[in-house]
Amino acid sequence: QIERTREHYRHEMLATDFLLQGALKLLEQVRDKQLRLDRTIEVSVTNAAEKKAIMLRIVPNVRTLQHLLRQNRADYMRSINKKLPMRQRRAAWKNLVIRRNKAVRLVEEMNLRTGKLQPLFEKLRRASNRMIEVRALLADKDSLTQPGMPTVDELNGELHYLMRLTFETPKTLE
């Protein structure tokens, strides 16, 4: 039961393009020998055979992850494009979610240490909280007229920046 809960937590944590991009960067650094394998991936320091097997899997997995995340970027832009019909936008989001799940399975296969992903998750949480704050400010028309408050355009700009950064909307991060 505990292991299943842990797996569910990791899956939920990884199932965003923001964290998948971070996981990809970590795997690229291991592949390029900028980060130590045994400090980034859960593997015994003394298990040379397992280390070798992981290094052989990293190259194709990184290539596949890059491809999936590139496609996700295009589908994300389609899904938030209000000029497209809702049917196309929903189809793009559905494809994005399917690819995210494939990417999560690839990252899980590599067994990255949760401690390496936790800082990224905290950044995502802060971005999510800020999106909620910005939406609340935009909804409160009275506060927008007070001196020193950002303009509607500035707030919308910040919200769109955070959405492009995380490939999420405030609603999808709830």
Region locations from a protein language model:
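Transcription initiation cofactors for RNA polymerase, centered on bacterial
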Residues: 1-174
